[in-house]
Amino acid sequence: MTKKDKKPKISTIVTKEGDTVKVFEDLDTFETFIKNETEDEEFDHVNCHLKYYPPFVLHESHEDPEKIKETVNSHNRKFVRHLHQHVEKHLLKDIRERLQLPQLKFNDKSKEETPDHIVWRYNQRANFHERDFDIHVTVECHHDSALVDVDYLTVPVPAVAAA
């Protein structure tokens, strides 16, 4: 049996618009990146994408992605329910902790459901170190796979000039 590759699974791509996006394949690396950006004072202009198997899916397949059942996708109500619980109770909570913003609630949320996918959107304005910024988290699961896409974007809010 060979050793697993322990290198961080991260890459950087540039979009057509010229934006730089960090792409992660691992939840821990993603969360560590957010924590480091917060500590480096670059928390208000982050654009990253995470594509991963949720921990509950890996647990059921004994940590082997090859053993994940084909029925584990957006058409499976149990998968969707567990994914939503994972997002609400773990992913968003971990983002709050990494940003050092325990008061972050993500009250502006929505759900879009189509035959091909389910998308949850979470938005919140936050203030950290006297800087306002918007946080956008989009979680998407598809009809053909247990892989989950997470887009994490923070955008600085321009300061309003005093009249």
UniProtKB/Swiss-Prot annotation:
Keywords: Cell membrane, Membrane. One of its GO terms (biological process) is energy reserve metabolic process. The keyword Glycosyltransferase does not apply. GO terms for cellular component: plasma membrane. InterPro entries: RGI1, RGI1_sf. It is a peripheral membrane protein. It is found in: Cell membrane. Involved in the control of energetic metabolism and significantly contribute to cell fitness, especially under respiratory growth conditions. Belongs to the RGI1 family. This is Respiratory growth induced protein 1.
